[in-house]
Amino acid sequence: MIAVLRIFALAIFAILMFVFGCGYCLLSPRNPKHVFTFGRYFGRMSKIFGMKLELRIPEDAYSRGQHVYVANHQNSWDLFTISSAVTPKVVTVGKKSLVWMPLFGQLYWLTGNILIDRANRSKAVGTIDQVVTSLKESDVSVWMFPEGTRSRGRGLLPFKTGAFHAAIGAGLPVIPIVCSSTGGVKLNRWNNGHVIVEMLPPISTEGYDKSNVRQLANQAREQMAAKLEELDKEVVELNKK
């Protein structure tokens, strides 16, 4: 019964977001400010699914300059958890097929996010070049999921290097963001416990280039894997209380 009520609430939310969200975005199509606005709205839905969401974001996170953000990508719950960590003037980079997702896909495009064709390597590489150009010509930051796909309970997957090529090309630091594991969240469970999203310190890209981009990716992954393990242990203890 709980699952049915939540699905109903989600359906209502999706329709409202699509109708009013698209209408709002059409006033200034593909404006980066929309990503921050709707990230907050989606994050508030975590309460509907019985999650106690805790954001750990530095005080200066909302006034920092440009960065390339990298986050772990677990499952569909990311939409209601890690999306809350999006800061102003940040757009995400997602797969092109997202635009065909009913309701969400059209809103995703209108809010100014970047779509890439991951099935076509040459097009994907070209898009990374476009991301670098966009970073150099604007004050917008980008958010990417370096795993390239949802991990679905398999832990932190190996990282692709696209995000790190973009960071090096634009001469920007990388900021990792980690969300504790949400594989145990169930639609039919009233209390789904704590979920922690934490923003880590920036990683400088100075001294890196195409020849050692893998080293940068590995450094970020090691930090994120350690933080994920730490957060998961903390969540276990919090859920016992």
Task: Report residues per predicted region.
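Membrane-targeting alpha-helical segments
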Residues: 1, 45-48
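Membrane-interfacial terminal anchoring regions of lipid-handling membrane enzymes
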Residues: 1-26, 59-62, 215-241
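Catalytic core of membrane glycerolipid acyltransferases/transacylases, capturing the structured
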Residues: 17, 21-29, 33-35, 48-49, ...
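Aromatic-capped interface at the extracytoplasmic side
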Residues: 28, 53-55, 186
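N-terminal nucleotide/polyanion-binding subdomain common to many enzyme families
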Residues: 38-45
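Generic preference for hydrophobic
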Residues: 55, 69, 92, 197-199
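A short beta-turn/loop motif at secondary-structure boundaries
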Residues: 58-63, 189-191
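Non-catalytic C-terminal accessory region of glycerolipid acyltransferases
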Residues: 125-241
